[in-house]
């Protein structure tokens, strides 16, 4: 008997798109339901990439009749960041210790239920209660800031003004931090205005912040109200015993539990000078969502010392 060649789920969709389209009225009438079912072929391919490399990945794609759905950059990320897994739950409550600003290979953070390494999580828990009491009944108010060529570093000015407004608490999450001027703004707020600063950084880009800190010859003991944590993104566990942790690709700031500033910017000179970004300022009850996200990231974070 002739063996039937498998056709992958994505491959079938691509081939279907090559067929001449029906009139719009016919398509609207016969519109198929959105298929959100699991694609086992892509899972097998990803697991094979993690455990056996590009060769095994291509082999599974050919066997399953599926298209190559990963970009070259994504493949490199899988190969460089895949790790052996003990199949333990990432949120197992284990003590992960702390990272050092001087260490070259920071440990992989786990995800305890509540972080007891610093007061950042508890501070935000208290702040969340404050915002629930003070602004839950308020309507959300959103203001959008877009990049404009006639206002140099406009988004950076917005961020700096937002930092300056903080009186008691400033919680920050960012994927990339290399801007010395913004670091000075934060340290001045912490040391001179006694604002509690809680900074969470992406674990893979932590070395960028560490290098800046060391280059400036700063000492953590001189800034007791300034805490730094690192955190991973989601963790994918392959059935073949490998795992892959993602990155934090979000940036937002919360000041005094009253306002949140979020957007596509990073804390870097390139972000302000040449990259096109946007930001939006949120007030009212919607700030609660940012506080809850900060608490989730805090519970999975690893403190950085140095």
Show the residue positions of the predicted features:
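Hydrophobic pocket-lining residues within nucleotide cofactor-binding pockets
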Residues: 177
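HKD-type phospholipase D/PLD-like phosphodiesterase module
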Residues: 1-161, 180, 184, 196-259, ...
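Amphipathic alpha-helical interface segments within eukaryotic helical scaffold
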Residues: 171-172, 181-193
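Structural motif
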Residues: 168-171, 259
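Short catalytic-loop micro-motif centered on adjacent basic/acidic residues
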Residues: 170-174, 199-200
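Secondary-structure "cap/kink" motif recognition
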Residues: 162-167
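Cysteine/selenocysteine-centered motifs that mediate thiol-based redox chemistry or coordinate metal-sulfur cofactors
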Residues: 289-306
């Amino acid at each position: 008997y002739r063996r039937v060649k498998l056709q992958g789920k994505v491959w079938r969709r691509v081939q279907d798109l090559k067929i001449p389209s029906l009139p719009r009225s016919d398509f609207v009438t016969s519109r198929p339901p959105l298929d959100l079912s699991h694609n086992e072929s892509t899972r097998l391919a990803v697991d094979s990439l993690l455990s056996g490399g590009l060769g095994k990945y291509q082999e599974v794609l050919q066997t399953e009749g599926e298209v190559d759905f990963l970009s070259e950059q994504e493949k490199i990320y899988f190969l460089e960041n895949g790790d052996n897994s003990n199949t333990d739950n990432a949120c197992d409550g284990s003590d992960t210790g702390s990272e050092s600003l001087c260490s070259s290979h920071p440990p992989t953070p786990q995800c305890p239920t509540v972080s007891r390494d610093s007061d950042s999580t508890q501070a935000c828990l208290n702040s969340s209660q404050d915002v629930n009491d003070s602004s839950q009944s308020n309507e959300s108010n959103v203001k959008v800031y877009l990049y404009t060529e006639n206002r140099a570093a406009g988004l950076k000015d917005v961020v700096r003004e937002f930092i300056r407004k903080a009186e008691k608490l400033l919680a920050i999450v960012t994927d990339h931090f290399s801007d010395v001027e913004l670091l000075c703004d934060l340290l001045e707020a912490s040391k001179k205005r006694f604002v509690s600063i809680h900074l969470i950084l992406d674990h893979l880009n932590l070395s960028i912040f560490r290098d800046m800190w060391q280059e400036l010859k700063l000492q953590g003991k001189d800034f007791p109200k300034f805490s730094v944590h690192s955190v991973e993104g989601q963790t994918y566990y392959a059935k073949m015993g490998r795992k892959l942790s993602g990155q934090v690709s979000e940036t937002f700031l919360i000041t005094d539990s009253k306002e949140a500033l979020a957007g596509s910017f990073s804390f870097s000179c390139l972000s302000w000078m040449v990259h096109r970004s946007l930001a939006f300022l949120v007030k009212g009850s919607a700030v609660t969502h940012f506080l809850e996200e900060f608490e989730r990231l805090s519970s999975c974070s690893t403190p950085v010392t140095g």
